[in-house]
């Protein structure tokens, strides 16, 4: 095939194209002079389609004669040619091919003009496709002729374009044509090529109008031409990215071909279509693989995948929340850095939205889209159905209080979503729409919405919300909406009645913060828009469990906890069962809360977003030593969990243990490290890296200090001992020396042997 115009080699490409065009013109002109002009025009980007059709019509006639035999040979030798075509393609792949690669890659757009012309003439596919397309449109006889001319056109154009012996290339083309994907791909590189491709299915269908074998041959020829080794590889590289476009175009053209076929009344149109369709199916598969995009066909699969993602997200969220709770010292910083860790991590909080028409049907909608999560941040009222109002509400929303978006009767429709303000209502509606879309797609997969609602709400939304709350500060009792908590998937009426303001949804505005803020002693502060960190507390449905937790954790907040029960004064039996099911899900939450220090006297500074008195207290650097206490508490909780105690027993035991630990914490050393430098508490605490790192750092610092003290004391003792030893030895030596001296001095010598004074000698 002729070299594709390279932006750098436009001139050379044009020359090559001109030569290829001339050759193709010669052949086509022998048949009819028109093709040459179409080729020239085809070189023009804008004129390509029409001129291609002209060229194809003329070339088709010329090629008909040349390719009639070739097409038949191709039909017979298509398998063998198939293998041949590929070797040939490497052969033809020589400079032109590489040029084609480079030029196509660099100047894929450049193909549009000269390249497309040459590709059209050379990849007969486009030219044949367009030619067949236009020729079929123009001349029915040309269609039949096109089939053969395509083969001949492939030869002539292949010769002219490739300027390489392309007769072997023709078999290669035939072989290539066997894979229509390639032909589409080869033709696709340039936008015009894509146009040609769009027409290619049409052409294929026109060729389908011809006898099946003939049409298929033509298609094969076309594909072979287009997939001529140079074009094939060059185009394949450029076209793989555009394979999707090719698929699209092929599909589009696929639809046109029926029209052409029907208009042409081709005998083999249906068969040709079928042949084209199978060829295109692989294309679609290729598109999926290359683009990593999900086809509409896999919508159901996507739905199921989404549901799975939701469950996984919840599990991850729970792990994160536990890790945070285990390392309370890190919690304040963690909250500051990651106000909504789940949202940041892309863990989408599930909001189960029950759309009830009247108090009857309740569609369960799971919305886990990031947009929804963001909206949930803005609209705390949008709750993951049961207890959790996933995101923190805007301060204004909190101030306004959470009012059920719908009246108690309408509250049943969306008990989950209570919009604090008109803005929230808008976001709520958006969430509903998105959730409804997802729900509609998901519901087919799952069981009836009621069943999904009960299970999903109980299992998924609960963990997500509760752990989200924990992560963001369980006790940041921003205006928690007991309404949502009270709402149960089963009884929406009970939910509406149970809504924090049991008497009326409107009363909830003022009430929820106080009742749901057992931990926070200052209800008014809670009413104030808490910092975005504030996560709505445990669902009102779980208020009983929350009360128990708070009693265990914050005995001082018991008075307020009394308020909490008000949230669910008349839990419906459905909600009770849901609470029972949820208790198990909340057990990790209880463990986490228990692990947190049970100091009711938390520093709940009104401004601090993390109104977790105990958390803030323990998190304060002054109480870094409390980490060990937390670890011990965690170990107690973990041991209780392992023992398999029922939630109530576990709570009791944990509460007692935590109290004992608090009493003993002063006497107990922070952490007892074994030979390996780890303790069972650390192992069993399921600490996240941050908390574990903090504990290890504290421990190491402590050890270093102790070691330094020991070293100092030992060094002081050794110095003293050394000094004493040296002094004593010196004294002893001096004494001995003095004795000898005295003896010598006292020793009477003869006068002749009198020696100078020993002092002079010694000195």
Curated annotation (Swiss-Prot):
<dbReference type="GO" id="GO:0045202">
    <property type="term" value="C:synapse"/>
</dbReference>
<feature type="compositionally biased region" description="Polar residues">
    <location>
        <begin position="27"/>
        <end position="44"/>
    </location>
</feature>
<comment type="function">
    <text>May be involved in neurite outgrowth.</text>
</comment>
<dbReference type="GO" id="GO:0070561">
    <property type="term" value="P:vitamin D receptor signaling pathway"/>
</dbReference>
<feature type="compositionally biased region" description="Basic and acidic residues">
    <location>
        <begin position="518"/>
        <end position="539"/>
    </location>
</feature>
<feature type="region of interest" description="Disordered">
    <location>
        <begin position="420"/>
        <end position="452"/>
    </location>
</feature>
<feature type="region of interest" description="Disordered">
    <location>
        <begin position="1"/>
        <end position="48"/>
    </location>
</feature>
<dbReference type="Pfam" id="PF15235">
    <property type="entry name" value="GRIN_C"/>
</dbReference>
<feature type="region of interest" description="Disordered">
    <location>
        <begin position="65"/>
        <end position="111"/>
    </location>
</feature>
<feature type="compositionally biased region" description="Polar residues">
    <location>
        <begin position="437"/>
        <end position="450"/>
    </location>
</feature>
<feature type="region of interest" description="Disordered">
    <location>
        <begin position="711"/>
        <end position="737"/>
    </location>
</feature>
<keyword id="KW-0597">Phosphoprotein</keyword>
<feature type="region of interest" description="Disordered">
    <location>
        <begin position="192"/>
        <end position="268"/>
    </location>
</feature>
<feature type="region of interest" description="Disordered">
    <location>
        <begin position="471"/>
        <end position="624"/>
    </location>
</feature>
<feature type="modified residue" description="Phosphoserine">
    <location>
        <position position="359"/>
    </location>
</feature>
<dbReference type="GO" id="GO:0048667">
    <property type="term" value="P:cell morphogenesis involved in neuron differentiation"/>
</dbReference>
<dbReference type="InterPro" id="IPR032745">
    <property type="entry name" value="GRIN_C"/>
</dbReference>
<dbReference type="GO" id="GO:0098976">
    <property type="term" value="P:excitatory chemical synaptic transmission"/>
</dbReference>
<feature type="compositionally biased region" description="Basic and acidic residues">
    <location>
        <begin position="480"/>
        <end position="496"/>
    </location>
</feature>
<dbReference type="GO" id="GO:0019228">
    <property type="term" value="P:neuronal action potential"/>
</dbReference>
<feature type="compositionally biased region" description="Low complexity">
    <location>
        <begin position="593"/>
        <end position="609"/>
    </location>
</feature>
<feature type="modified residue" description="Phosphoserine">
    <location>
        <position position="323"/>
    </location>
</feature>
<feature type="compositionally biased region" description="Basic and acidic residues">
    <location>
        <begin position="93"/>
        <end position="104"/>
    </location>
</feature>
<dbReference type="InterPro" id="IPR026646">
    <property type="entry name" value="GPRIN2-like/GPRIN3"/>
</dbReference>
<dbReference type="GO" id="GO:0042220">
    <property type="term" value="P:response to cocaine"/>
</dbReference>
<dbReference type="GO" id="GO:0007626">
    <property type="term" value="P:locomotory behavior"/>
</dbReference>
<protein>
    <recommendedName>
        <fullName>G protein-regulated inducer of neurite outgrowth 3</fullName>
    </recommendedName>
</protein>
<feature type="compositionally biased region" description="Polar residues">
    <location>
        <begin position="237"/>
        <end position="250"/>
    </location>
</feature>
């Amino acid at each position: 095939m002729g070299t594709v115009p390279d932006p750098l080699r436009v001139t050379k490409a044009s020359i090559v194209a001109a030569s290829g065009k001339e050759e193709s013109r010669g052949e086509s002109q022998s048949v009819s002079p028109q093709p040459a002009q179409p080729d020239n025009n085809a070189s023009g980007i804008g004129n390509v389609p029409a001129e291609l059709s002209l060229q194809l019509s003329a070339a088709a006639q010329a090629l008909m004669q040349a390719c009639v035999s070739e097409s038949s040979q191709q039909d017979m030798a298509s398998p063998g040619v198939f293998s041949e075509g590929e070797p040939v393609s490497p052969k033809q792949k020589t400079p032109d091919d590489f040029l084609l690669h480079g030029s196509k890659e660099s100047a894929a757009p450049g193909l549009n003009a000269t390249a497309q012309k040459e590709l059209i003439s050379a990849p007969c596919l486009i030219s044949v496709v367009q030619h067949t397309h236009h020729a079929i449109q123009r001349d029915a006889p040309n269609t039949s002729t096109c089939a053969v001319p395509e083969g001949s056109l492939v030869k002539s154009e292949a010769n002219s374009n490739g300027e390489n012996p392309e007769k072997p290339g023709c078999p290669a083309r035939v072989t290539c044509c066997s894979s229509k994907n390639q032909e589409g791909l080869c033709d696709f590189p340039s936008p015009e090529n894509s146009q040609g491709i769009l027409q290619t299915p049409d052409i294929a269908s026109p060729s389908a109008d011809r006898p099946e074998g003939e049409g298929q041959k033509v298609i094969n020829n076309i594909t072979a031409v287009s997939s001529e080794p140079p074009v094939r590889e060059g185009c394949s590289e450029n076209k793989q990215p555009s394979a999707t476009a090719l698929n699209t175009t092929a599909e589009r053209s696929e639809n046109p071909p029926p029209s052409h076929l029907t208009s042409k009344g081709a005998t083999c149109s249906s068969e040709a279509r079928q042949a084209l369709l199978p060829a295109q199916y692989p294309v679609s598969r290729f598109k999926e693989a290359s683009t990593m995009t999900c086809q509409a066909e896999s919508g159901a699969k996507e739905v199921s995948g989404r549901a799975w993602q939701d469950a996984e997200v919840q599990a991850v969220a729970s792990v994160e929340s536990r890790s945070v709770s285990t390392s309370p010292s890190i919690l304040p910083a963690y909250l500051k850095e990651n106000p909504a860790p789940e949202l940041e991590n892309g863990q989408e909080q599930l909001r189960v939205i029950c759309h009830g028409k009247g108090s009857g049907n309740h569609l369960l909608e799971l919305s886990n889209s990031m947009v929804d999560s963001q909206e949930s941040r803005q609209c705390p009222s949008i709750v993951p159905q049961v207890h959790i109002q996933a995101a923190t509400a805007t301060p204004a929303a909190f101030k306004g209080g959470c009012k059920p978006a719908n009246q108690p009767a309408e509250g049943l429709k969306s008990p989950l979503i209570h919009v604090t303000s008109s803005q929230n209502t808008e976001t709520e509606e958006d969430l509903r729409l998105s959730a409804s879309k997802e729900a509609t797609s998901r519901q087919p997969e799952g069981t009836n919405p009621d069943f999904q609602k009960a299970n999903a709400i109980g299992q998924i939304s609960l963990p997500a919300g509760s752990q989200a709350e924990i992560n963001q500060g369980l006790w940041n009792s921003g205006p928690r909406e007991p309404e949502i908590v009270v709402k149960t998937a089963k009884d929406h009426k009970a939910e509406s009645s149970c809504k924090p303001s049991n008497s009326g949804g409107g009363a909830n505005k003022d009430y929820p913060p106080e009742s749901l803020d057992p931990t926070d002693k200052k209800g008014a502060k809670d009413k104030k828009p808490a910092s975005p960190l504030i996560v709505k507390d445990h669902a009102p449905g779980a208020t009983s469990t929350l009360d128990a937790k708070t009693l265990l954790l914050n005995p001082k907040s018991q008075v307020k906890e009394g308020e909490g029960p008000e949230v669910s004064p008349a839990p419906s039996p459905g909600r009770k069962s849901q609470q029972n099911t949820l208790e198990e899900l909340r057990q990790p939450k209880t463990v986490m809360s228990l692990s947190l220090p049970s100091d009711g006297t938390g520093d709940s500074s009104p401004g601090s977003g993390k109104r977790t008195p105990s958390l803030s207290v323990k998190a304060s650097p002054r109480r870094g030593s409390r980490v060990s206490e937390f670890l011990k508490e965690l170990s107690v909780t973990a041991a209780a969990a392992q023992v398999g105690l029922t939630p109530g027993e576990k709570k009791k035991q944990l509460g007692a243990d935590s109290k004992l630990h608090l009493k003993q914490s002063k006497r107990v050393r922070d952490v007892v490290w074994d030979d390996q430098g780890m303790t069972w508490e650390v192992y069993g605490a399921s600490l996240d890296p941050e908390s574990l790192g903090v504990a290890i750092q504290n421990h190491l610092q402590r050890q270093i200090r102790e070691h330094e003290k020991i070293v100092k004391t030992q060094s002081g003792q050794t110095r003293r001992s050394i000094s004493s030893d040296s002094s004593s030895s010196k004294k002893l030596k001096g004494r001995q020396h003095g004795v000898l001296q005295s003896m010598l001095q006292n020793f009477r010598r003869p006068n002749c042997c009198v020696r100078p004074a020993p002092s002079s000698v010694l000195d």
